[in-house]
Structure formats: structure tokens, C-alpha cells
Regions:
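An N-terminal assembly and electron-transfer interface module characteristic of large anaerobic redox
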Residues: 1, 15, 23, 27-28, ...
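Glycine-rich beta-strand-to-loop/alpha-helix junction loops that act as flexible
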Residues: 2-13
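FAD-binding beta-loop-beta segment adjacent to the flavin cofactor pocket
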Residues: 18
Length: 780
């Protein structure tokens, strides 16, 4: 330290910091009179040196509002008119007028209404109803949403509360918001194309939360299952005839009018985009707003970005202007079950391919699918620059403008590229990527650490000719490796799995296989394997192969399902035993116990006395075994009896829920149900198995019909079932998991007979969390 010390920076607002320096260095310390802006002043000096005599291209924060009409050139106005034309096409034919002699259908301007409003308007007006669409999201919408919303959903879903409340205040007779279960993408080849878990549930959940029925309003929420064709959608819409009191033939005619309106709108927007692309010059730079339909035109969800870009003289189009639906990317993304994801990545390919196009990619805070898609989007864009901004309710206008200015400035230095004479925007590169369903022999196969299940799963794979090993248990260092590759609010299992693979690769670069199962949708966890593959490819880990069987179809695809189920049951039976008895029980078994050994152990455990409170634990498999920060083991050590939802039962439920994929195995599934029932009877008071597993479907169907994602139907039903015979229920899920939020929105707390406590896991369990849990258990 020298003799003259000057403290700078906003930290000097803290007098304790200043006093600490002065106590150490005395009068040598002075506080700069401009300490709070010294960094900005230094950055300005550096910028001045870099610019030299050149003129700045910065147009100022207030420029869009300053003499806007006078300063716009004809070209800018033309671009603005072009962009706004899509919104005009969406609302074509809508008046918003209310005839007091007619009943009124209110429509929240949210989610898929941004695609289906032409159909909605044509359908209901043809039937003689008034149609009232809520205004575009405003500060008042946000205020109402913040006042009435339950839980931390993604921002687009949270805004629905505000839109519905506005319709309640307008005293409409009906509120129309469809439930999107599946939505077919034209070129998709996946088994099912799911809407996200919120699209599958939001309409009913929010209507119930706002209690619209008590206010004399009826919810119209037909379930759209586009995977089953237009007939399925027609059937869903025609099903409204009974509620509306209108004969089906009249509804059918109105539906035809609505369907034609949607097709006209889609074709008109794509025609617009094709015409614009045909007029581009080599030095033109067109910005493509990449997000879902509702994120494009909603003035809050798009954060005013289209206007900011247009005001700066750029042409702006949206994903809908590009022929994204014409691309088949199935060979590269064979299990991308989100239709929006397919469209977004198709758009990314088109943008990366066209030299004049640049992406502005908007993601949503709290959106599970976006946490995975953003990795794949980055891979598609390669070296081409793009701007990605996460949308949430706390965004800063100044921050958005600053990022836009920096991005546009970088584009100024991109050289102009003339299109080849034979250029075809749809001729993009496809890089086939097929993840193996079964392991290769003679190559080490690493299994995720899953507590008591891992040794028996390893024995199962060894019987099938594999060379199995267990991945390391989660540590802070391993999690840091995984999180170094994350960019958003990825669920905890993703960085944990990725980090464990990267940790293993640091020690050994020889060929290896890693087991990361997939699902058919619709939670983010089904995409872990494909995104981890993308990360490994970027890191040139070509010797690391993934084995990613589809969980829903294991009964049809797996070798020796009987042995696989015994491996799962072995872990379930060990967890049913008191913790201090588990080692002795497993020591009596073969590497993979047979049926007689399992039943003998179950009877021995059933003969033991139970002690302590009975606490149910229901959640995702990794959270119940490896990612709970030792909470369940600690409770057992304190004398509590923890009844963990059996993994065998959870997968059996998933397989039965997807019986169309497993019909040849229906008889085997019935046999396994009988085995679980027998084992449950033998375990007695130690059993976490349902006495009659079929009752789980009755509970699930009443609360979450037409739902796919995170095995949420089982988790809901199991929590309710266990609550009738336990003192408390703990639900364990990764923080930010959308399915966990859905279960809460569907009233799981109220449905359970015992008190319920949610463990939202992100590897940060601490004394404060323990205090909350202990306070909860004290009253159970």
C-alpha cells in the first residue's frame, strides 16, 4: 500500500467498510467524492479512447419517445407497419362489441389464444355469442396477477390470473381457455407432442383459484389433443355444445369457420415473411424474434423489444414469418416432444443458415423447457452472434436497452454477405443424433448414484452382459462442474448428473457409457440426456456415449423385465426396513435377489416393531435417494419411520399410464401388481406400497386427468394415498420444477389427510431449512 489510498465504488455507502479501512491505514485513507460513479467514469474514459474522433452510434435512452413521429424515416415506418401487420391479422374480424341480448364469452389474451384467437372468435360469434378479448397485458394486468396468483409459476402463466380477473370484473358469462395436452408439429415424428405441464393444467387451476364458478362464470376449457388429429380437436370443441345448450350440428358449422380462420392467418403471416426475405440486400440485417406465440405480441412478455429494434432502423420479423414448420429435424432431435421447441430449433437452423438473419431469443424465467432448449439453441447458432434475454416481472428497461445497444453495435461490424444464386433457406444442415437404448458390451457403463437401488440395477445390467459401475456421489465440487455448464434455473438433477459425468471424464478419457434415461414428456427431465449429449459434443468428449432408454416403454424394450423389476423391488424393500437392519438384509441376498429372497426379507421386516412417527416421502427418484441433502436419512437416525414412495410402484404406474405403448406387456404388469400387493402385505406396517394400486389411478384421474410430465399423476395420487396412514407427508422435488408447482396449484395440500411439507431442493439445505422442517414436524 502507498501513502495515499482512495476508496472508490458503491461499497463506500457502507460506513462500516470505510471505518475498517481507516482503522487499518489511518489518515492515508480518503473516500473519493464521486465514489459511487467512479467505475462508470472510468468506463467512459476507456470508451472515449476507443472511439477517438469517430462519432458515437449511441442514440440515447429517450430517443424512441423524442419527436418520434417527426424523426422516423419512411423506411423505419415501413418496417413498423410490416411488423404490426401480424397482430392485425390475428385480430381480423374482432369487434369487442357486446349485445346485451346475447351471452358473452370472455377470452384471456394469453398463452395459445395468441394462435387460436381467429378460431375462437369465428366459432363463438357464429354461434351468436359476444366475444370479449382482454386487452394486451398492461400494468393493471400485472397488478391483478400479483394480487391473485398462487405460487411462483413462469411469468406467462402468472399473467393469466390478471387476465381472468379482468374478465371476472367485466361480468362475462363464460371464460374460454383451452387445455393443451398435445399439439402436433407438422414434421414431428415423436410419439407425442406435448404442451408444457402448465399448458396442460393452467386453465382449470387458475379458474379454481379465482373461484369463477361462485361468481356465475362457467369455464370452457376443451382438452386439445392434436396428436390424435383434427377429429380429436373437433370432438373437444363440439363437446362444448352441451354446456352452451346449442345442438352439435350448429357447433360443427361454427368450428369449420374457425378452423379456416386459423389456416388463413398462418398462411398470411408466412407469406409476409417470404416476401420480405425476397427483397433483402447483402448488407441488410434482419432481426428475428424467437419465442412462443404469446411472447411475440404481448407487450409485457416481449419487454418492448420489437419497438426498440424497429426504432433503431432494423427490420424485425418473428418465427412465424419463417418456414420453420417445413423442416424435419427429427433425425437430430428424435425425442424433442415440445412442439414449440421443435419450431424454435427449426428457426435457429434457418437463422444460422441465412446470412441476413440474426436471432433475438426470449426465454421465460421459471420455464422448465426453456432451461433445456437454451442449450440446444446455443448449439444451433454456433459462432453466429445472437441476443438472449430472460423475461420476468422484475426486468429493467434500462438493462434491456443496454443489452440491445451492445448487440446491435456488434452487428455493425459483421461483413455483408451476398446470397448464392441458388440459395434455399430450407436446405439446412442436419446432424443425426440417436442416443442408444441399450448398452454395448465390453465398454464400462456408469450408473447414476441412486441410493439403495444402484447395486441391484448394476447387478441387473451385469446379467445382461454390461460392465456396470456407479458414478460418484454428489459433492460441491461435482455440482460446480455441472453448474459451470448451466445458464438458467436448470433443475438440480441436471447439473448433478452432468457434473458426475464430467468428474469421471477428468479421471479417465477411455471409452465409457453413461446411463441417463429419457421420458416421452412433458417435463424438462426428459431432455436431460439430449442436452448432456450437446454439452459433451461441445467439449469434444467423443469417447463418452450415453445410454438413454425410454422409461415409458421399458416393458417392451428392456431385456428380462422380470429381473429389472426385482432390482427395483430390492431397493424398495431395503428402504422399508429400519436403517440399522438394511446391511444385514442385503448381505443375505444374491447380487440380484430372486423372488423367494425378496419375500423372505419382506416377512422378516414385517415382523419388526415400528417406532417413531410415520412420515411419507414422495417425489422424484433422485430427490428421494441422492439429492435430499441427507434429510431422510437424518430423520430415520432420529427415530422417525420414513415411508418412501416405492420406485417399482412409480414406474409400474407410469407403464400402466402408457398402456397403449405396453399392450403386449399388460399381463406381465398385472403379475407385478400382484407381487407388489403380496410384498406390501408381508411388510405390514413397514410397507409404502398401496394396498390396491388401482386406487392410485382413481385419485390421479380426479385431480390430474390428461396430464403428462414428471410422473406427476403418480406423485399426486401417492401423496394422497400415503397421507391416510402417516402423520405427515414430505414432497421432495427440485427447486423450480414445474410439475411440483402444478401439484400445489391442484390443491395437493388440501387433498392430503395429513399435513404436507414441500422440500424444494437445490443443494442448499441449511439450518434455517431444518428449523422450518422441525417446526412443521413438531405439530404432526
Amino acid at each position: 500500500m502507498g501513502q495515499h489510498i482512495v476508496l472508490q465504488g458503491g461499497v463506500d455507502y457502507n460506513p462500516g467498510i470505510v471505518a475498517a479501512f481507516q482503522s487499518a491505514y489511518g489518515d492515508r485513507v480518503q473516500v473519493s467524492p464521486v465514489f459511487s460513479i467512479s467505475g462508470a467514469y472510468g468506463a467512459a474514459l476507456l470508451a472515449q479512447e476507443a472511439v477517438g474522433d469517430a462519432l458515437s452510434r449511441f442514440v440515447g435512452f429517450d430517443s424512441p419517445a423524442k419527436d418520434a413521429e417527426d424523426s422516423r424515416s419512411a423506411e423505419i415506418q415501413k418496417n413498423i407497419d410490416f411488423y404490426k401487420q401480424a397482430d392485425k391479422l390475428l385480430l381480423e374480424g374482432y369487434t369487442g362489441k357486446r349485445d346485451p341480448r346475447k351471452k358473452t364469452v370472455g377470452v384471456p389474451f394469453a398463452l395459445m389464444i395468441h394462435k387460436f384467437f381467429p378460431m375462437t372468435n369465428a366459432f363463438f360469434t357464429s354461434l351468436g355469442f359476444n366475444v370479449v378479448l382482454t386487452d394486451p397485458t398492461s400494468e393493471e394486468t400485472i397488478r391483478l396477477a400479483q394480487k391473485t396468483a398462487q405460487g411462483e409459476t413462469c411469468y406467462p402463466v402468472k399473467l393469466i390470473y390478471g387476465h381472468m380477473q379482468q374478465l371476472i370484473d367485466q361480468k362475462v358469462d363464460y371464460i374460454f381457455l383451452p387445455t393443451i395436452h398435445t399439439m402436433k408439429h407438422e414434421k414431428s415424428r415423436v410419439k407425442h407432442n406435448y404442451g408444457c405441464v402448465y399448458m396442460q393444467t393452467a386453465a382449470v387451476s387458475i379458474a379454481n383459484a379465482l373461484d369463477i364458478e361462485s361468481k356465475g362464470i362457467t369455464l370452457l376449457s376443451p382438452v386439445f389433443d392434436f396428436d390424435f388429429g383434427q377429429e380429436a380437436m373437433a370432438s373437444a370443441m363440439l363437446g362444448l355444445s352441451k354446456i352452451l345448450g346449442i345442438p352439435k350440428p350448429f357447433c360443427a358449422k361454427a368450428l369449420l369457420s374457425g378452423a379456416m380462420a386459423v389456416r388463413r392467418h398462418t398462411a398470411a403471416v408466412e407469406k409476409q415473411g417470404k416476401a420480405l426475405l425476397a427483397t433483402l440486400r447483402p448488407d441488410d440485417k434482419v432481426l428475428v424474434l424467437i419465442t412462443r406465440n404469446y411472447g411475440v405480441s404481448d407487450p409485457i412478455l416481449n419487454m418492448g423489444i420489437p419497438e426498440l429494434l424497429l426504432e433503431r432502423g432494423y427490420k424485425v420479423i418473428t418465427l412465424s414469418h419463417l418456414p420453420g414448420h417445413a423442416l424435419d429435424i427429427s433425425d437430430e432431435y428424435d425425442n424433442l416432444y415440445y412442439p414449440f421447441g421443435q419450431h424454435i430449433l427449426s428457426g435457429a437452423k434457418l437463422i444460422a443458415h441465412h446470412p441476413n438473419l440474426y436471432a433475438v431469443y426470449l426465454t421465460n424465467h421459471g420455464c422448465g423447457p426453456d432451461t433445456m432448449l437454451s442449450h440446444l439453441f446455443k448449439q444451433e447458432m454456433g459462432d453466429k452472434p445472437y441476443l438472449q434475454i430472460e423475461v420476468d416481472e422484475h426486468f429493467s428497461n434500462v438493462g434491456v436497452i443496454t443489452r440491445i445497444e451492445a448487440f446491435l453495435n456488434s452487428l455493425q461490424h459483421r461483413p455483408a454477405v451476398a446470397l448464392p444464386t441458388d440459395f434455399n433457406i430450407e436446405q439446412v444442415d442436419i446432424h443425426p443424433c440417436r442416443l442408444a437404448q441399450t448398452p454395448s458390451p465390453n465398454v464400462p457403463l456408469y450408473l447414476p448414484a441412486m441410493g439403495a437401488y444402484t447395486p441391484y440395477l448394476a447387478a441387473y445390467f451385469k446379467q445382461q452382459g454390461a460392465d456396470p459401475y456407479e458414478l460418484p456421489h454428489l459433492t460441491d465440487d461435482i455440482l460446480s462442474l455441472g453448474r459451470a455448464e448451466t445458464s438458467a434455473k436448470e433443475y438440480l438433477p441436471f447439473p448433478a448428473l452432468l457434473g458426475s459425468i464430467l468428474a469421471e471424464r477428468k479421471n479417465d478419457q477411455t471409452p465409457a457409457q453413461f446411463l441417463i434415461p429419457q421420458t416421452q414428456g412433458a417435463e424438462a427431465d426428459g431432455q436431460y440426456a439430449r442436452v448432456i449429449r450437446a454439452v459433451l459434443d461441445r467439449r469434444k468428449e467423443l469417447n463418452a456415449q450415453l445410454v438413454s432408454p425410454m422409461l415409458e416403454t421399458l416393458p417392451e424394450m428392456a431385456q428380462n423385465c422380470d429381473a429389472l423389476f426385482r432390482a427395483l423391488l430390492a431397493g424398495d424393500i431395503l428402504y422399508a426396513a429400519p436403517a440399522d437392519k438394511r446391511a444385514d438384509i442385503s448381505a443375505q441376498w444374491d447380487a440380484l435377489p430372486g423372488w423367494e429372497q425378496l419375500h423372505t426379507a419382506a416377512r422378516e421386516i414385517g415382523a419388526l416393531l415400528t417406532k417413531g412417527r410415520r412420515i411419507a416421502a414422495v417425489g422424484t427418484p433422485l430427490c428421494l435417494t441422492e439429492l435430499d441433502s441427507g434429510v431422510l436419512a437424518a430423520l430415520e437416525a432420529e427415530g422417525e419411520q420414513v415411508l418412501r414412495a416405492p420406485l417399482s410402484e412409480a414406474l409400474w404406474f407410469l407403464w400402466k399410464d402408457n398402456l397403449d405403448d405396453n399392450k403386449p406387456s399388460a399381463g406381465w404388469l398385472d403379475q407385478m401388481q400382484r407381487q407388489m400387493q403380496t410384498l406390501g402385505n408381508e411388510l405390514g406396517a413397514h410397507s409404502a406400497f398401496a394396498e390396491d394400486a388401482e386406487t392410485l389411478f382413481l385419485i390421479a384421474d380426479s385431480a390430474l386427468p390428461n396430464f403428462s410430465g414428471g410422473n406427476g399423476r403418480y406423485r399426486y395420487a401417492k401423496a394422497v394415498e400415503l397421507s391416510s396412514r402417516t402423520n405427515a407427508v414430505l414432497t421432495l422435488a427440485p427447486r423450480y420444477e414445474n410439475t411440483a408447482m402444478i401439484l400445489d396449484m391442484r390443491g395437493l395440500h388440501d387433498a392430503c389427510s395429513a399435513p404436507l411439507f414441500q422440500l424444494s431442493l437445490d443443494n442448499d439445505w441449511d439450518e434455517t431449512a431444518w428449523s422450518r422442517l422441525r417446526s412443521f414436524l413438531y405439530y404432526c
